[in-house]
A protein has these predicted regions:
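Acidic/histidine-rich catalytic cores of soluble enzymes
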Residues: 114-168
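Short, small-residue-enriched loops and turns at beta-alpha junctions
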Residues: 12-14, 40-43, 67, 92-94, ...
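N-terminal pre-domain/capping segments
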Residues: 1-83
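Hydrophobic/aromatic residues located in beta-strands of well-ordered beta-sheets
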Residues: 4, 60, 85, 119, ...
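Charged helix-capping and loop-helix junction motifs
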Residues: 20-21, 47-51, 98-106, 133-138, ...
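Alpha-helix-loop-beta-strand connector modules within alpha/beta enzyme cores
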Residues: 47-65, 108-112, 137-147
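Conserved beta-strand positions
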Residues: 8, 36, 87, 121, ...
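Glycine/small-residue-rich loop that forms an oxyanion/phosphate-binding "nest" at active or ligand-binding sites
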Residues: 70-106
């Protein structure tokens, strides 16, 4: 049976007022777990969050994190059982920047791997723009180590007339 997860950004305004109540409702909707969104973890310790989510039959699959919060998240997220630390997107405007971004993703992937997680990249529509003869997302995929970096394809951002999102 498939598992379904929800990104907490969908409920960010409600979560700040009633974290446990909102999460309990999310669990009752049939979700198996969450993707933490920029530190929305209800003020729980890592172990406390994992225990609370387990009590409502959910888990942390991933977390969107800002680059400047990487070190803090490398300490916090493993205790929650989180599997993926997700970069929310990069502003890439040249082939050189795309190659530099790929190396950055590999570097972050090595850090995530050192604590038992995998680093991921969340696309936006600009990642499907061509730089020369290749789309940015293709440059990133071709130049990152799949053992270190995963790609979280956001189908809404990938939906373009010239892109077959199913390929990704």
């Amino acid at each position: 049976m498939d598992k379904f997860y929800v990104q907490l950004d969908s409920f960010s305004r409600q979560l700040v007022h009633d974290y446990e109540g909102v999460m309990t409702k999310v669990a009752k909707l049939g979700y198996n777990g969450i993707e933490i969104f920029y530190g929305l973890h209800g003020g729980y310790s890592p172990e406390g969050l994992k225990k609370f989510l387990n009590s409502i039959n959910m888990e942390v699959i991933s977390s969107h994190v800002e680059t400047e919060d990487t070190e803090e998240n490398l300490k916090y997220l493993p205790g929650t059982g989180c599997k993926y630390m997700i970069n929310p997107g990069l502003a890439i405007t040249s082939v050189q920047e795309a190659h530099e971004a790929a190396e950055f993703l590999n570097e972050m992937g090595r850090k995530a791997k050192s604590v038992g997680m995998k680093y991921g990249y969340h696309n936006h529509s600009n990642d499907f723009l061509k730089l020369g003869d290749k789309m940015i997302c293709d440059i990133l995929i071709e130049n990152t180590d799949p053992e270190l970096v995963a790609f979280e394809i956001d189908l809404a951002w990938a939906y373009r007339p010239d892109v077959d999102a199913a390929e990704y």
